[in-house]
A protein has these predicted regions:
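Catalytic NTP-binding/metal-coordinating core of nucleotidyl cyclase/transferase enzymes
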Residues: 1-70, 75
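Catalytic beta-strand-to-alpha-helix segment of the class III nucleotidyl cyclase homology domain
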Residues: 35-38, 42, 54-134
Length: 134
């Protein structure tokens, strides 16, 4: 078991946005969003665990997670998007998936523990453009 800062991000009304701009426009929007987020992730020393219409990330230090969140909010606003971010520090277990499973599409690392759903719920409480930290 280890302690880390867990970060969940979510783009507000992403489904409506995709309906409005279409699949091709959405593909470009996601590419821009993902590039900005991953650049910030690298600069702040985090790890990408999963991606949907947002990210699930871990950081060794809460300060690094907070710096990521500030940059992420600025980047999404610059892209004309509204994001909510939740950060929670807690104990988790990191489990490596077998290489054969990763080759079939599994994530390389799974994060287990109560801190994970707690962090997701913190994010769900945030409004667009807001970051909450517990």
């Amino acid at each position: 078991m280890t302690s880390c800062a867990l970060v969940f991000t979510d783009l507000v009304d992403s489904t409506l946005l995709v309906q409005r701009i279409g699949d091709a426009g959405a593909a470009q929007m996601w590419a821009n969003h993902d590039r900005a987020a991953r650049d910030l992730l690298t600069r702040n020393g985090g790890r990408e665990i999963d991606r949907t219409d947002g990210f699930f990330l871990t950081f060794d230090e809460v300060a690094d997670a907070a710096h990521f969140a500030v940059g992420y909010q600025r980047a999404t606003q610059a892209l004309g998007l509204a994001a909510r971010v939740g950060i929670h520090h807690g104990a988790v277990t990191l489990r490596q998936n077998a290489p054969a499973d990763v080759a079939r599409g599994a994530k390389p690392v799974e994060v287990e523990g109560l801190a994970k759903p707690f962090a997701a719920r913190v994010m769900a409480l945030a409004a667009g453009g807001q970051t909450l930290l517990s």
